[in-house]
């Protein structure tokens, strides 16, 4: 299932060290990264957590991210979280962007510059210092996963062909452990994430398709298991079926096929029509996103109405 060109990973894992819900301005740092990813069209976005973090799920529930639970719940290292995210996205995207949650202040323009640069591993640099996020191709994922040394992510990337991109963005280095620095960058970062916020839905007499249901169908197609799809999307089992049943009533055909029983406990998968619907919606969403970004840039950024 290679539906998108760029997938994203945000490593949270060690909640105490990472501080994903640290408020900088009016929003938590993890929300800043999700917004930045979404502005350049990253999907799916995978958040790697170290346990059942209900507060985090509530914070991100409306943003359509995938929650992956790390097996080593207590004190996973950064590389462990990277590995979990890469294992999930391998084969699903042509490129993957990664950032630890405690580096939240890089801008959408910086990320777009990295994505516009060809290279197996693309790393931003500010005044000679490398930072985050890091972009790598799907072909590099097996090499990162195969690393077994003691130097973590740095060691895994050390022998890979890296392309450095100079950026005028100190946010690639700003760390949540230095809250004063985050706050110094706040005004500039808030300006960088000004964007047209389209919360797309399909409606009939009432809304019947949203970002949450899009993600749920994506995960059903990926896992063929409703409970796993619900756990990874942060949607309750009963709510998931309510949304699917409403969608099927409005469309007039089955979107999800239920197979009960058997040694495996049954499975859930998209019907051919359901898969076609999801693919068409994603293509539609991409086209609307690109059009909106272009119009916003033309009417507000290039005219310097917003600077």
Model feature map: region roles:
Residues 249-269:
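A short LG(V/I)-centered, amphipathic sequence patch enriched
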